[in-house]
């Protein structure tokens, strides 16, 4: 069940996910501490409520855009000069001592430290083990989280572009209908804030996992994933009360102002024998944008 090819694997429970503390640090700028509890009221509210059974959907999750791509590194070989050029005088060159190094462009670095509730962490790992032991021997919570991150970036971009037809096989029909009404009523800036570039996702957390059976004996797994991401969308600060705003230094040039937003995506899959192993998104919530 290569998660990368089909997307993710699954769960959900209902305990509060305590607000982890995130520290953002950039070269040449002041260190900023952000408390995720203060910016993710939506996630805290959802995780603190009791888990109610969610309608089952059988939409397929097969988009090739969700496959994970391995990073590639270019290899630079050594340049060899032809023999005819060996006799030519060497062109003047400048050497650098340890005290005089060629000036290099600074790169923005960010260090994220997140701390989850240890009880919630242990519980989700136990449920992940049960999924592996009884439902899917190829299931891995680490691979699922990575696939969920890619799915979040892909789906949020389509949402911001109002390409709802491309989401029909990824999002539950009832959920998609509600999203159409909410997203189309947003301003352009708020629509842009929905999109999360995968490089701007600073923290991912497994919020909840649930395993349950319906009255017909069908087996279902729900996994709630919480994401925190940066956006440079031009949104008035008063429209996002409680959101953290800070500056990111881009090398040695300009300074860009970004906001830290949160979103919750719930993934669902039916594990009944004979049913296709497809994942679907059963709930989408963007704190302060889609409420």
Curated annotation (Swiss-Prot):
The keyword Transit peptide applies. Coiled coil: none annotated. It is found in: Mitochondrion matrix. It comes from Mus musculus (Mouse). GO terms for cellular component: mitochondrial matrix. This is m-AAA protease-interacting protein 1, mitochondrial. Residues 1-96 form a transit peptide. Keywords: Mitochondrion, Transit peptide. It comes from the Eukaryota. The gene is Maip1. Promotes sorting of SMDT1/EMRE in mitochondria by ensuring its maturation. Interacts with the transit peptide region of SMDT1/EMRE precursor protein in the mitochondrial matrix, leading to protect it against protein degradation by YME1L1, thereby ensuring SMDT1/EMRE maturation by the mitochondrial processing peptidase (PMPCA and PMPCB). GO terms for biological process: calcium import into the mitochondrion; mitochondrial calcium ion homeostasis; protein insertion into mitochondrial membrane. Interacts with AFG3L2. Interacts with SPG7. Interacts with SMDT1/EMRE (via the N-terminal transit peptide); interaction is direct and takes place before maturation of SMDT1/EMRE.
């Amino acid at each position: 069940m290569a998660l990368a090819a089909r997307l993710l694997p699954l769960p959900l429970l209902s305990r509060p996910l305590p607000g982890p503390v995130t520290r953002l640090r950039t070269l040449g700028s002041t260190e900023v501490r952000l408390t995720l509890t203060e910016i993710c009221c939506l996630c805290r509210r959802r995780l603190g409520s009791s888990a109610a059974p969610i309608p089952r959907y059988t939409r397929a999750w097969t988009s090739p855009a969700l496959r994970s791509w391995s990073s590639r590194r270019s290899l630079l070989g050594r340049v060899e000069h032809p023999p005819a050029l060996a006799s030519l005088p060497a062109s003047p060159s400048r050497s650098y001592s340890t005290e005089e190094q060629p000036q290099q462009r600074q790169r923005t670095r960010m260090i994220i430290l997140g701390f989850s509730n240890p009880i919630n962490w242990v519980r989700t790992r136990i449920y992940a083990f049960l999924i592996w032991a009884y439902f899917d021997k190829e299931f891995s919570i680490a691979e699922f989280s990575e696939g969920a991150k890619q799915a979040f970036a892909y789906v949020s971009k389509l949402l911001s572009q109002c390409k709802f037809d491309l989401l029909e096989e990824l999002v539950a029909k009832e959920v998609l209908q509600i999203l159409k009404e909410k997203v189309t009523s947003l301003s352009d800036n708020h629509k842009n804030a929905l999109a999360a570039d995968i490089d701007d996702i600073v923290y991912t957390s497994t919020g909840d996992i649930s395993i349950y059976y319906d009255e017909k004996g069908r087996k279902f797994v729900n996994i709630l994933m919480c994401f925190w991401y940066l956006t440079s969308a031009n949104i008035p600060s008063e429209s996002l009360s409680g959101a953290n705003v800070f500056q990111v230094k881009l090398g040695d040039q300009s300074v860009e102002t970004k906001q830290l937003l949160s979103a919750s995506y719930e993934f669902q899959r039916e594990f009944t024998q004979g049913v296709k192993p497809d994942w679907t998104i059963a709930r989408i919530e963007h704190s302060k944008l889609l409420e």
